[in-house]
Amino acid sequence: MVLSWGKSPSGEKRQKVAPKPKEPKSETEAYASLKLIREAAKRIAPFAKVTPVHTCSSIDDMMSDETDKIDGATIELFFKCETFQKGGAFKFRGAMNSILQLSKAELKAGVVTHSSGNHAGALALAAKTKGIPSYIVVPEGAPQCKLDAIETYGGQITRCEATVPDREATCAKIQTETGATLVPPYNYGPVICGQGTIGLEFMEQVPDLDVVIVPISGGGMISGIAAAVKGIRKECVVIAAEPMGAGACAADAFESKKRNQLVDDLPVPDTIADGLKAKMGTLTWPVVRDKVDAVITVTEDEIVAAMKVIYERMKLVVEPSGAVGLAAAMSTQFKEFNRQNPPWGKVSKHKKVGVVLCGGNVDLALLAKLFAPS
């Protein structure tokens, strides 16, 4: 389309080409965009830590097999250590970002959530930071170290059955009684954007990352990270790392990507990665669908092996969920993806791989059991 627009000095009619219509915004832009994540970063800056990035040459050596050495290809790993975040895991970011957007009346009434792990402790700590009450619904079977953390941070614990309907019903009852605001663990815009600040920091710390590997469960963390990473460096590949569970049944994120639709009817995986048992939600799935390039599944043995490597080589303690990213990086699936996937395989001979170590809250008794000689 051409629009007329006045006359030139010579008297000839001057024309201006109409601007191209703007592309419609993605359905996820309203709750998971780079702009919103940058706003979240400014909001939580006085409260959350900028976590360090560590490297380990001995693990890099383990990543290169004989074929890689012949071809001259190398992989360098960069570990984003959310184990050093307040509360010992990444969840504090999303919890703090959520609380900081509440009204005065909402702050006075407090917050409520249901969680078996790090989100519960993170919300209790964020609430304590702002001096407001927190009500935490915890299903049976939650790790004792995480229960202890909730109590230390002043959270008021209510136990329930380990089913989603019972968790939600218990939360609803507390909301009715107290007027508290529900802060969901992952399927919530402020939580997604808070977790997305991990990706923002990571790309500032290592601007030329070729790939980022992130553990996935409900999808709050990887949705935020993918939105940030793809917004800054579109060619950077984002890979989800998901536990298969002891039953070796396909996990829901893997199946959802495979079928290109949200799969939410699979059984909860029986896995030592207790923080990765949730299913993706209606907000997180569209981001995973559009911005996550692949899903790599890992076994229980691979998770334990990754924990041992991190402990022995890096001298860091991570919980099973926190080691899932490295387990994926060390897997044969990742080697195949590296060799066969053109967008990632053609980047360079020297490939920079980011791995998010998402948490370090693990019972020492479990650690001793996992590391005991078989």
Annotate each predicted stretch with a short phrase.
Residues 2-374:
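PLP-dependent amino-acid enzyme catalytic core
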